[in-house]
A protein has these predicted regions:
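Short hydrophobic alpha-helical segments enriched in small aliphatic residues
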Residues: 12, 16, 20, 30, ...
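N-terminal FAD-binding dinucleotide-binding subdomain shared by FAD-dependent oxidases/monooxygenases
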Residues: 37, 62, 96, 108-180, ...
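Glycine-rich Rossmann-fold phosphate-binding loop(s) that bind the pyrophosphate
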Residues: 184-190, 362-363
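Hydrophobic alpha-helical signal/anchor motif
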Residues: 20, 44-45, 70, 75
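Short, Lys/Arg-enriched N-terminal segments with co-localized hydrophobic residues
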Residues: 87-106
Length: 713
């Protein structure tokens, strides 16, 4: 991002030295080495420094007015470009400082606000535009607009059971016993098994539906697929496996290879079973064991069960009339058909050279694969209901000298700093400086004012950020009409932000057409030969569904496993009034059962892998401690569940909310397709204090050593 949102009038962060000139408003050519250090805060905190979009200003008596309950200041300016660096330039110039200090400082001022003139837009006009864009996309069928795939549907079977990357593996049914069975072989399951191994628990079996480890990264092999979190923080267990990613943002092939690396390093392949779906879990009270049955005829027993299926394990399809009638070729992006398209994850889709292709969906997946489709297809139609916000990626190869200089503990430290920075904490560019942290930098620590005032300031900052991103569309896309349709008119975090250096430019190609379907709330129908949108039929040879996963459907549906606990009670019956647990991990009436990563998404942050590692370590500690004490059964008390719910209620709303309310966002999986009000239940929401606070909470529980809240036998 070339410009950052103008939140610096509230908190300025100066961290670089630079060349400055002159004194007061008359800049001269004399060069100085500028520096700003913490002691300067005492001198400037009571002065009026205002950040504007194109210039910096310093006035002792700013002119003020009121607008919409927010104080506005009109100021003059130095004729010098603005930006984070120039705070240090301005202040060093002001006080004649010299030197090479590089320490950060924060300057808090409660009444320095931007004017509409300096903003370059009218917040009221933008707010109205956002509301209009939301309303025209709201559908009464909400989440039911998507096809619910089931194993009984021949049409859906290829998205649930067929594996385009491997032949079926035959094996005899298993009837053995394990200390721990982990269900799921993606990051959640692998991290849980790895942390169990480190805790001395080696009798562990992973049951995975795919043909290898990797989970999402086994299935998602579409061209251009890559992580959107810095790989040094996202790829788990880097230090443990002695690996440093080749790129700052790894592509899917490298991530899948790392999953295999983890499996080999921790010897997880030895007892794992692949191409296997668990069909039921049943607690055997007289044995204090779980009975696990599968589609392969297995009847395994386990002392402990770890559910690690993750949130993106079930693809979804749009419920477009006629979707099953199409006579051409079709597939979901998570089951990419390279036999049809040719090429591979890096592109070169030669099989599409004479094909007219349609892709439905413009979320994070489409942003990554559309460039390769545009390069290869004879004609590409991109059907878009809501555009993604697309910022620059700026990927780069890993510096080998940097990789060699890393000290023990580097990844945990980096993950910790990313989590803090994402939630508005201090940022050290030497560790974390990417698109995510640029979007959220300093938003939490705005001003020591009321929550209402902070919300207003955050909204202005969000407007400015999105104006910058919309400006990038204008700079990149040559056709003004197409550019306007590609602009995202909603708050930054209404949808998962995307970062890509090739997506927008793809719409400059003559063989690529954007089909906006916002006015009709989506594609109208699919025929035997094509797609009907806006009353027009588009004949196509192939339809690619970039429609994502059932992220927010019920846990019962996403998991797809009947679970029966004490007295043969179903866990879904226990959750009839909403999901409930202790720590988001254990459920009363279901002894020795751990929900890892999928049931309760506790962290308000972007790096999911870090969050599940926190849970995996805690689960490993709990199981190893139970084993050490000779405990056969550990059941959460109802009181412990109620205390956790009470804690959730107490902290609800206390976390840092990025962007706008789900009630004001355009429809998407973040707000249950625009119906967030209906589904609000504190038992389903994030742990609003964030992953850092969650880590401290679990650490305190472990340090107490009492296994508080567990009924032990």
């Amino acid at each position: 991002m070339r410009l950052f949102c103008p939140i610096y009038p509230i908190i300025a962060s100066a961290h670089r030295s630079g060349n400055v000139a002159g004194a007061r408003g008359n800049l001269k050519s004399a060069r100085k080495s500028a520096a700003v250090f913490r002691g300067l805060q005492r001198k400037v905190v009571n002065r009026q420094y205002v950040f504007a979009s194109a210039a910096l200003s310093a006035r002792d008596e700013p002119q003020q007015r009121e607008s919409g309950g927010i104080r506005i200041e009109r100021v003059g300016s130095y004729s010098r470009p603005a930006g984070p660096t120039h705070w240090s330039v301005l202040l060093a110039m002001r006080y004649g400082l010299q030197g090479n200090h590089r320490e950060d400082f924060k300057m808090t001022k409660t009444n320095d606000i931007l004017s509409n003139e300096s903003l370059g837009f009218d917040p009221d006009v933008l707010a109205q535009r956002y509301a209009e864009e939301r309303e025209k996309r709201i559908r009464p069928d909400a989440e039911t607009q998507f096809v619910q795939l089931s194993h009984d549907s021949p049409f859906a079977n290829k998205y649930l059971e067929e594996d385009p990357y491997s032949e079926t593996l035959e094996r005899a049914p298993l009837k053995d016993q394990r200390e721990v069975i982990v269900i799921g072989g993606g990051w959640v399951g692998m991290l849980t098994a790895a942390r169990l191994s480190q805790a001395g628990i080696h009798d562990v079996r992973i049951v995975e539906s795919g043909s290898d480890f990797g989970g999402t990264w086994y299935w998602n092999r579409y061209p251009g697929a890559q992580c959107d979190i810095e790989s040094y923080s996202y790829l788990p267990l880097l230090e443990e496996t002695g690996y440093v990613p080749k790129l700052r943002y790894s592509y899917a092939s490298e991530i899948y290879e790392h999953a295999q690396r983890i499996g080999k390093h921790f010897d997880l392949y030895k007892d794992a079973v692949f191409q296997t779906w668990v069909t039921e879990l049943r607690w055997l009270e007289d044995e204090s064991m779980w009975l696990v049955t599968t589609n392969r005829g297995d009847t395994m027993r386990a002392r402990h069960i770890c559910l690690g299926t993750g949130p993106a394990n079930r693809p979804r399809l749009p419920g477009i009339p006629g979707v099953e009638q199409f006579k051409g070729h079709s597939f979901h992006t998570c089951r990419w058909d390279y036999d049809y398209t040719g090429g591979g994850p890096t592109g070169g889709l030669a099989g599409l050279a004479d094909k007219t292709v349609a892709i439905i969906g413009t979320g994070a997946t489409a942003v990554q694969c559309v460039p390769a489709l545009g390069e290869s297809a004879k004609q590409l139609y991109v059907f878009q209901r809501t555009p993604s916000s697309v910022d620059v990626r700026n990927n780069a190869e890993t510096d080998p000298l940097w990789a060699e200089s890393l000290e023990p503990g580097w990844q945990r430290d980096r993950q910790k700093k990313f989590g803090e920075a994402f939630l508005g904490g201090p940022i050290d560019p030497a560790f974390v400086d990417d698109g995510w942290t640029r979007l959220t930098r300093n938003l939490k620590q705005l001003v020591a004012q009321s929550e209402e005032k902070i919300s207003g300031l955050a909204q202005i900052a969000d407007f400015k950020t999105m104006e910058t991103i919309r400006g990038l569309v204008d700079e990149t896309v040559k056709d003004p009409e197409v550019a306007e349709k590609l602009k995202a008119y909603y708050n930054q975090f209404c949808k998962r932000p995307t970062f890509n250096d090739f997506y927008l430019d793809t719409f400059n190609r003559e063989n690529v057409a954007l089909v906006d379907v916002s006015e009709t709330q989506g594609v109208e129908a699919i025929t035997e030969t094509g797609i009907i949108a806006n009353g027009q039929e588009y004949p196509v040879d192939c339809i690619i569904y970039a429609s994502g996963f059932e992220i927010t459907s019920s846990y019962e549906r996403r998991l797809g496993i009947p679970i029966f606990g004490v007295d043969e009670k179903s866990i879904y019956e226990h959750w009839e009034a909403g999901m409930r647990s202790m720590h988001g991990l254990m459920v009363s009436g279901f002894p020795n059962l751990f929900l890892c990563g999928g049931g309760f998404v506790f962290q308000l942050g972007a790096n999911y892998a870090h969050g599940i590692d926190v849970q995996a370590g805690h689960v490993a500690y709990t199981i190893s401690e139970l084993s050490r004490r000779g405990i056969q059964s550990a059941n959460v008390s109802l009181d412990a569940e109620e205390r956790w719910i009470a804690d959730q209620l107490e902290t609800k709303g206390g976390g840092f909310v990025l962007g706008g309310s789900p009630d004001t966002c355009t429809p998407g999986y973040y707000n249950q397709e625009g119906t967030a009000k209906r589904y609000r239940n504190v038992r389903r929401e994030t742990y609003s204090k964030g992953v850092g606070a969650y880590m401290k909470l679990l650490r305190a529980w472990r340090n107490d050593g009492q296994l508080d809240g567990l009924e032990l036998k």
